[in-house]
């Protein structure tokens, strides 16, 4: 199963990052075959580390600013939702991008689990 791990860049802090990484390990579905990432700092990088340590392929969707301008991160989030079969969202309670992605999952019928950190 293609699992997207999304969340705020606020998880760069070492202590918070270690907690978030542990939560990835606890919440990732057992049948995960690929990790999907947005390529940003924070939770996206932790997702890529998890994939490398568990020998899982990674699909990274980077925002295309040349094509979409300031909408690039939102378009990237939509691409992630369209590609993923399951989304694991780490939310800090304030990230608008994560909230948007969770709402997109619900709208598109993509299973999503929100983990508050």
Language model feature labels by segment:
Residues 2, 10-117:
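Acidic/glycine-enriched connector segments
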């Amino acid at each position: 199963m293609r699992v997207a791990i999304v969340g705020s860049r606020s998880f760069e802090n070492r202590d918070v990052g270690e907690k978030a990484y542990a939560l990835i390990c606890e919440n990732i579905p057992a049948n995960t075959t690929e990790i999907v990432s947005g390529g940003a700092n924070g939770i996206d990088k932790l997702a890529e580390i998890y994939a490398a340590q568990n020998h899982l392929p990674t699909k990274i969707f980077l925002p295309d600013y040349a094509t979409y301008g300031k909408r690039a991160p939102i378009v990237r989030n939509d691409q992630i939702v369209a590609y993923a079969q399951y989304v694991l969202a780490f939310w800090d309670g304030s990230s608008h991008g994560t909230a948007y992605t969770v709402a997109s999952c619900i709208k598109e019928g993509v299973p999503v689990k929100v983990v508050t950190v």
